[in-house]
Every structure is written in structure tokens, then in C-alpha cells.
Regions:
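N-terminal active-site wall of soluble small-molecule enzyme domains
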Residues: 40-99, 104-108
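Conserved anion-binding
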Residues: 43-48, 102-170, 174
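Glycine-rich, proline-tolerant flexible connector loops at the mouths of alpha/beta enzymes
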Residues: 5-17, 36-58, 222-232
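Active-site-adjacent loop and "lid" segments of alpha/beta metabolic enzymes
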Residues: 50-59, 97-102, 158-165, 185-211, ...
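Active-site glycine- and acidic-residue-rich loops that bind
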Residues: 10-23, 122-133, 152-170, 186-204
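Alpha-helix-loop-beta-strand connector modules within alpha/beta enzyme cores
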Residues: 23-32, 53-77, 112-118, 168-178, ...
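A short alpha/beta connector and helix-capping loop motif
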Residues: 18-22, 85-86, 91-101, 106-115, ...
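Hydrophobic faces of well-ordered beta-strands that scaffold small-molecule active sites
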Residues: 5-8, 36-40, 76-78, 96-98, ...
């Protein structure tokens, strides 16, 4: 099975950002023979603070994602937070993602699966890898085209996450594709005064450790200038560092 790569900014900030990232991902795909899937959120519905930037919203966001596909020929992934969003999102993207906090929401998982698109279900920060059989079964019974499971760490006290890499082989017993979210797993939730902190310097180590445990997909949030990012600034990877990391994982 070919290794899957997913990369893009945390949130849709501007058309210019999407264009810059799309151009670089397309170039990496040509150079390395990969098929990196472009990801970005049209709405960050679970930001820490009411004043945090959320994105352009569904209608405008989907149009901006469509423009990325048209210009750069990239497959697309975005996440949904409410069941009614599944149908319009399914008309635009190749992969519908279920956020970790929402992976037990039956109606949400079923709505995504009924589009027939690939569904990427992120493991909640409070679940074990073995627990992911239940969201997987919901998506399978509802007719998902393909189902991926994603590891993104577990809560460790307050404002911290740790990764139990044993979850990866446990989830591989359930689904053939297990993705490592290498950037959200280095978050420090709510630890930066009304926003999430993080430690991006650990992203490459997370990726290689996950590969050693059998992960066959890798998820990276990237930005040309992460510290200026409007969401998850502390844990996004520099766009210029992505190609070297992807190459090292092939």
C-alpha cells in the first residue's frame, strides 16, 4: 500500500495562502512521485476562545478549496462539525474528516459515510486505539467509500498530550489505513493563554516513531510562516521543511 500524505494549513486564511501551499505540494508531488492530499478547514468550530479566527465558512471555503483543485490538481480533505455539512462538502472534497472530539457522534459519522467518500476519523484524545472499532463500524455500515483512522495523541493531565504508539498497531487491526497526525499530536491544548500552544520541533520524531509502529499515512499542518498562522501557529510545520520530511518517510 502506498504511503498516504495529507498536508495544508490548519485553517483557510486567504486565497493567497492556499495558492502558496498548493503550489508547493504540487511541486513536491512531481519531484517525489507522491500524491499529497491538500487539507484545510473552512471553519474551526472548536477554537479555545470566542475571539479566535475561525475561517471563511462553508460556502466560501468550499469554493476556495475547489480553486486549489482546479489550479494545482490536488485531491482535497476537509473536516465537518455538523451532519448537514456532509452533503455539500462531499460534492467538493475527496476525503471528509471527522474531528477527534466528535468521533463518537453517530449522526456525524453516518452522514459523512453516506456521501460515499473516504472518511478519515480522528481518534479522540480520551479513547484507546481499540475503541476506534466502533466509529469504524458506524462508517462502514453507512457506506463509506474507504475509512481511515488517525492517531493524534491522548490527554495527559491538563494542557498536554502524549502519544501511545501502541494505538497504531491496535488500529491497524481495525482499518487498513492508519494515519499519524504529526502536528496536532505535539499540541499543548489551551496552554498559551486562550489559545493552543505546541512544540513543532518534535514533529519529525513523531512521524518516524509512527512509521516504526506501522503507520501508513502521515498528516502535517504546514504554513509558509507558522508563527504568523491564525490557528495552531505553535505546532504547524514550516512549509519549506515538508519536502525533506516526506522524502525521509518514503
Amino acid at each position: 500500500m502506498a504511503i498516504k500524505f495529507i498536508a495544508g494549513p490548519c485553517v483557510i486564511e486567504s486565497a493567497e495562502l492556499l495558492d502558496a501551499v498548493g503550489e508547493r505540494l504540487a511541486a513536491i508531488n512531481r519531484t517525489l512521485g507522491t500524491e499529497i492530499i491538500f487539507k484545510a478547514s473552512f471553519d474551526k468550530a472548536n477554537r479555545t476562545s470566542i475571539s479566535s479566527f475561525r475561517g471563511p465558512g462553508l460556502e466560501k471555503g468550499l469554493q476556495m478549496l475547489s480553486d486549489v483543485r482546479a489550479k494545482w490538481g490536488l485531491r482535497l480533505l476537509t473536516d465537518i462539525h455538523e451532519s448537514w455539512q456532509a452533503a455539500p462538502v462531499g460534492e467538493v472534497v475527496d476525503v471528509i474528516q471527522i474531528p477527534a472530539f466528535l468521533c463518537r457522534q453517530t449522526d456525524l459519522v453516518v452522514a459523512a459515510a453516506r456521501t460515499g467518500k473516504t472518511v478519515n476519523v480522528k481518534k479522540a484524545q480520551f479513547l484507546s486505539g481499540a475503541d476506534m472499532r466502533y466509529p469504524y463500524e458506524k462508517a462502514r455500515e453507512a457506506g463509506a467509500g474507504d475509512i481511515w483512522l488517525t492517531e493524534r495523541g491522548n490527554s495527559f493531565g491538563y494542557n498536554n498530550l502524549v502519544v501511545d504508539f501502541r494505538n497504531i498497531p491496535d488500529m491497524l487491526k481495525i482499518a487498513p489505513t492508519v494515519v499519524m497526525d504529526c502536528t496536532h499530536s505535539v499540541q499543548r491544548p489551551g496552554a498559551a493563554g486562550g489559545k493552543t500552544g505546541g512544540n513543532r520541533e518534535f514533529v519529525p520524531a513523531m512521524a518516524h516513531a509512527a512509521k516504526a509502529f506501522g503507520a501508513n499515512g502521515f498528516f502535517f499542518e504546514v504554513h509558509p510562516d507558522p508563527d504568523k498562522g491564525l490557528s495552531d501557529a505553535a505546532n504547524m510545520l514550516r512549509l519549506d521543511d515538508l519536502e525533506t520530511l516526506v522524502k525521509s518517510l518514503l
